[in-house]
Amino acid sequence: EDTDPVLASRVHERLAYYLLELDAASDAEAAARVAVELLPADPPRKERARALATHAQTLMHAGDEAAASKRAQQARVAARAADAPWVETDALVTLGMLAEREGEPAQALDLFTQAYREAQALSMLGVELRAAFQKARAELESGDLAAAAATAHEGGQRADAAGLSLAPYGLDLQYLHYLAHYADGCWNHAGELADGFGVRVTTASEARLSAMALFLDVARGSPAVAERRAWLEPFWAGDSFGAYIARGLLAEHALWRGDTATALAEVAATLAEMDVEGGYGPPVIRVAAVGLAARGDQARRARAAGDDETAAAEVTAAQVLIDAAREGAAYPRRPKFVLGVDGRGWLARAEAEWARAQGRNDPEAWQAVVETFGPAFTYETARSRWRLAEALAEAGQRAEAEREWSLALAVADELGAVPLGIALRDLGRRARLGRPPGSGPGAGPDGGPADVLAGLTSREREVLRLLVAGRSNREIAAALFIAPKTASVHVSNILAKLNAASRGEAAAIAAAAGLTPADG
């Protein structure tokens, strides 16, 4: 019995579409090719135009950009001949994606914008949502956060009205809207959006949105982080993207808490799940930068303790991470690809953390991070200023350090970025930046315990906090940005003022007086 070729073509085209959704690019390309071959070019048919457009997508995802571009152009010609304008518009989105791969992000955005407007005029929701997602994503990559938020919001509303909020593009538009406001510092709005990203998830779509909520949870130090992790972990095996988002942010969460071992474990697990066939891509940059920060912290602690062997081992491990970040930026599979603003900012941060791990906390490197993110990326610029202030303080550039520190602290307080605020206040106390904390009745000059400790200066109190924490003179010097000899003098003065015979006795007196040990 003869099979209807039009029906067979439609079946193969739909098969290709769904195989593409499952990331089976090779099988999808084969099915789409059959869909095209089943129908002749003449007479013009909408089904053949649709098959050509889908084949273009499968070729693109299979990595054959030249053939994909040719097929997309053929799809547009066939669509015009068959009076299928929605297919012509859909192929335009594919051409925009191909322009990005050819290193033409501005041209790509123009094509996405054109396709979005055409799809709206045609009232073709499926094509409209695809174009909206690509347009919003490209706007986010270019650093135009306001435009990205507006496009994602509009597209998301259209998806929601059609009951597609958890369908692929509806879901993607929700998280792009949220990410744009996370990046631009509109955290109240981002928080309202994240309120809809439930913690107790039961589906893969819900889990992906919940993973996105970790951006804000981690940056604000929310207690919801641990519960989200518990609910998300079962979904990681089936959703590599969701796992990438969640574990990378959980690494940042551990880093804020000073738990470098857990941070590195999350980074290692994330890297292990990445597809490295043909080399790393841009997503590795952020994860590698977080790992480099952890390696840098461990290397600095080792140097402060005089453990050069451990410090050298940390540098060796950090080399692997910076190599991964640089490879991701080069993107061997798409050598013409141009990194967006966020990607360039994280690459600059990775380079600065690499220098820090080697013992060179370079102010110029951190200044480059601040400038690369720029004022639009409110939070990332603020936390880059934190590192810049630290580097400037270590270099003895106190006025510059205080300026960067003050700018970062103002943003941290405005956003409610609690972990960053804590880190900045710790830096301010150690490097003596800004006004000292106010003191209440009966308190010492830094607001701490009084009476037996009343004779200590604010700097001696900081040294004593570190003594209580068991730090050596060298570690105290590193923590407070002073010379080891100066630290030794402070310790001697403290022992004399407290009439203590040893460091241990001084620490015991301080503990009895209620002085809390320094963190770390």
Regions picked out by a protein language model, each given a short descriptive name:
Residues 1, 33-43, 73-83, 113-124, ...:
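Amphipathic alpha-helical segments of tetratricopeptide repeats
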Residues 6, 46, 86, 126, ...:
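Residue signature of alpha-solenoid helical repeat architecture, marking inter-repeat boundaries
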Residues 9-24, 47-64, 87-104, 127-144, ...:
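Tandem amphipathic alpha-helical repeat scaffolds
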Residues 19-31, 60-66, 244-246, 274-358, ...:
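Amphipathic helix-loop-helix modules that constitute alpha-helical solenoid scaffolds
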Residues 27-34, 67-74, 107-111:
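Structural signature of tandem alpha-helical TPR/SEL1-like repeats
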Residues 28, 68, 108, 148, ...:
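Single-residue signature of alpha-solenoid repeat helices
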Residues 354, 360, 378-380, 386-446, ...:
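N-terminal regulatory/sensing modules of transcriptional regulators
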Residues 429, 440-501, 505-520:
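Helix-turn-helix DNA-binding segment
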